[in-house]
Amino acid sequence: MKLHELKPAPGARTKPTRRGQGIGSGMGKTAGRGHKGQKARSGGGVRPGFEGGQMPLQRRMPKRGFTNRFKKEIIAVNIEKLNRFENGTTVTPEALLAARVIKKTGDGVKILGNGNLEKSLTVQAHAFSSTARQKIEAAGGRAEVI
């Protein structure tokens, strides 16, 4: 078989249906739109979410809450994730970002106390939970608020 002998698979190249091209095509006269009505007209059709005059779902659902424009996004990191750093290292939010422990620093990083810490580290973060602070100091490290 050579390149010039290649043929597309049967049924792979179908011609587009030409609507409104006579009754013999099967898509003549009304071109698949039925008779009259809003959807038969040029440019006709209902807007998204329209339910025929019935109160639409979006308006039937109650309004709830609001979006706080001043919210702070604090990134939480559990203490067990800090074991990947070498003994005696200073762990900063930038170091966590570089090590891909977190995807972004947001408005601050908070260290939480889930898991165990086997390394002695100096951890710098914007906030610490009480258990995280205890575990860092129990492992011989320091917890510094920045």
From Swiss-Prot:
Segments forming a coiled coil: none
Region described as Disordered: 1-66
InterPro entries the UniProt entry points to: Ribosomal_uL15, Ribosomal_uL15/eL18, Ribosomal_uL15/eL18_sf, Ribosomal_uL15_bac-type, Ribosomal_uL15_CS
Superkingdom of the source species: Bacteria
GO biological process, one term: translation
Bias type Gly residues, positions: 21-31, 42-52
Gene Ontology CC terms: cytosolic large ribosomal subunit
Gene3D superfamilies documented for this protein: 3.100.10.10
PROSITE patterns cross-referenced by the UniProt entry: RIBOSOMAL_L15
Alphabetized UniProt keyword annotations: Ribonucleoprotein, Ribosomal protein, RNA-binding, rRNA-binding
Keyword hit for rRNA-binding: yes
One Gene Ontology term of the molecular function aspect: rRNA binding
Family in the record: Belongs to the universal ribosomal protein uL15 family.
Role of this protein: Binds to the 23S rRNA.
The protein's assembly and partners: Part of the 50S ribosomal subunit.
Protein name in UniProt: Large ribosomal subunit protein uL15
Gene: rplO
